[in-house]
Amino acid sequence: MSKSASRARLADIIRNRSFGRGEITLASGRKSDFYFNLKPTMLDPEGAALLAELTYEALRDEQVDFIGGLEMGAVPLAGAIAQLSWLKNHPIAAFFVRKKPKEHGAKLAIEGLAKGESLAGKRCVIVEDVTTTGGSAIKAVEAVRESGAEIVLVLTMVDREEGATEAFAEAGLPFRSLYKASEFLNR
């Protein structure tokens, strides 16, 4: 399937499985009359494959070592992308950032790294399912930067177009999205 056909098919899947109308309170605390819940798309076999494919293609020239982000939205994405990158002979390892470090066991804030492995000096992409103001991704950026990694990009599947672009620009972070909310609202 061509990139444009993959993108169109994935938009259909998102529209049918993950987009809705109706009043909702977002993670940012804002109220909205539409929502994206990308979990049904990320956990659908075809949706997961297309998200991984399009994300992998978007990162192809970035020389990325790791991909991850804040739980829960980043977990299925990072895992699917890691698997596809291995199959494409260009491995990108995955991790995720806990919203709150575990209070037992290793008490880690960043999960997915082997014992003795570190993000220090690694080129990382922060990935997110849906971005409104960018607050969740910024939390992940802060944790990953604290570990010594370089953030090369913040990539979201759907940008709600409600301030994230400006917030990331202000923070000096490159930001891209696969889709914009207006692509779903204007149809």
Curated annotation (Swiss-Prot):
InterPro entries with a match to the protein in the record: OPRT, Or_phspho_trans_dom, PRibTrfase_dom, PRTase-like
Entry's Gene Ontology molecular function annotations: magnesium ion binding; orotate phosphoribosyltransferase activity
Catalytic activity: orotidine 5'-phosphate + diphosphate = orotate + 5-phospho-alpha-D-ribose 1-diphosphate
The keyword Glycosyltransferase is assigned to this record: yes
Coiled coil: none
Recorded superkingdom: Bacteria
Binding of 5-phospho-alpha-D-ribose 1-diphosphate, residues: 98-99, 102, 104, 128-136
Signal peptide residues on this chain, from the entry's feature table: none
EC numbers for this chain: 2.4.2.10
Classification via CDD domains: PRTases_typeI (cd06223)
UniProt binding sites for orotate: 132, 160
BP terms from Gene Ontology: 'de novo' UMP biosynthetic process; pyrimidine nucleobase biosynthetic process
Biological or metabolic pathway of the protein: Pyrimidine metabolism; UMP biosynthesis via de novo pathway; UMP from orotate: step 1/2
Keyword line: Glycosyltransferase, Magnesium, Pyrimidine biosynthesis, Transferase
The protein's required cofactors: Mg(2+)
Family: Belongs to the purine/pyrimidine phosphoribosyltransferase family. PyrE subfamily.
Assembly and binders: Homodimer.
Function noted in UniProt: Catalyzes the transfer of a ribosyl phosphate group from 5-phosphoribose 1-diphosphate to orotate, leading to the formation of orotidine monophosphate (OMP).
Protein name in UniProt: Orotate phosphoribosyltransferase
Gene name for this UniProt entry: pyrE
